Amino acid sequence: MPHSTNKELIFGIMVGTAGISLLLLWYHKVRKPEKTMKLPKFLSLDNTFNSITLQDEVHNDQGTTVIFQERQLQILEKLNELLTNMEELKEEIRFLKETVPKLEEYIQDELGGKITVHKVSPQHRARKRRLPTIQSSATSNSSEEAESEGGYITANTDTEEQSFPVPKAFNTHVEELNLDVLLQKVDHLRMSESGKSESFELLCDHKEKFRDKIEFMWRFARAYGDMYELSTNTQEKKHYANIGRTLSERAINRAPMNGHCHLWYAVLCGYVSEFEGLQNKINYGHLFKEHLDIAIKLLPEEPFLYYLKGRYCYTVSKLSWIEKKMAATLFGKIPSSTVQEALHNFLKAEELCPGYSNPNYMYLAKCYADLEENQNALKFCNLALLLPTVTKEDKEAQKEMQKIMTSLKR
């Protein structure tokens, strides 16, 4: 038999086999639908969440439901991990781009016999107390797992003794202050962006003396939150967030009726959640809301709390179907909020403190734009232009408001 005929015969057999396979597949899907399992409509754009349950979508089979929920959670965890890794990779690439030219310059200086002085960023300047005897100890990141208040496990929980200390080149004298003077000074320093690092250092200098004083404790936790905001390094941010959360949790345990302790615990839970997987993100979100509500009851005249509550409501109102379903799987109910509820909280912050902040005006403009009240949205954009731009958050808010104004004028 010619070679070409063999090839035609083989090809014919392959086509025939494929046809039979397709026929069998059609038979199982069309002729026997009762034996197939319905899959949930992940891509549905219908936002009706009132009576949908995972059990309805998997034939009310309890065992299958549990397995499906576990697989769903695993898939979401993997996707979240992938996104986190991509962000970390971007950060490392950016760091390398900045470092390589400096490394070349350093090598040239060393070869030329020059002595190089290393510059330290403000967030690295966490001072060590001067001790009578020099103690040397190896510092390492804690790998112990600590169970938090929410009843779940968080790895790599730091303590306040673990920091990024750098020897001071000058001004090694530490002025000893009494508690009232210290608190007034750190509160005043914190009013400016540049003073936050100095405020943090001042608290570090006095932590051994006042570490059990509740007014010192929550301010120290707040200062770690400030350092989180100032830092641009991912590992540093994670470090500051974990220490601050631990300190604020201790403060709550010592003074459960102090609203500031609950406020900063909520804020630092939000910071820590940035480095967690999806399940812990949702857990920390639950803690954030819980302690924010407690803080509002204890400090009803604090505008910052209503700003935070507004941000929470606005974020929840924008959650996707799958994110709401995940929260329902973990906590038994779907988190719900509306743009109107967010708007109410932002307006409350403005009522308590007119001209409260650029970010508050930005979110007011966003809410009104979402509600198609364009005149009110433009009103708050214009009011924001009258406020000074001091912090990094102020600058970001101004940029966002420029975008809002551009979109509203189209």
Swiss-Prot record:
Record-given protein name: Regulator of microtubule dynamics protein 2
Gene Ontology MF terms: microtubule binding
Residues recorded with modification Phosphoserine: 51, 121
Main location, first listed in the record: membrane
Gene symbol of the encoding locus: RMDN2
Species per Swiss-Prot/TrEMBL record: Macaca fascicularis (Crab-eating macaque)
Family per similarity comment: Belongs to the RMDN family.
Residue numbers carrying Phosphothreonine: 139, 154, 157
Keywords: Coiled coil, Cytoplasm, Cytoskeleton, Membrane, Microtubule, Phosphoprotein, Transmembrane, Transmembrane helix
Gene3D superfamilies hit by this protein: Tetratricopeptide repeat domain
Record's subcellular location: Membrane; Cytoplasm; Cytoplasm, Cytoskeleton, Spindle; Cytoplasm, Cytoskeleton, Spindle pole
Disordered, as annotated region: 122-151
Sequence positions bearing Phosphotyrosine: 152
SUPFAM superfamilies (UniProt xref): TPR-like (SSF48452)
Annotated coiled-coil segments of the chain: 68-110
One GO CC annotation: spindle microtubule
Presence of the UniProt keyword Membrane in the record: yes
Complex and partners: Interacts with microtubules.
Membrane topology annotation: Single-pass membrane protein
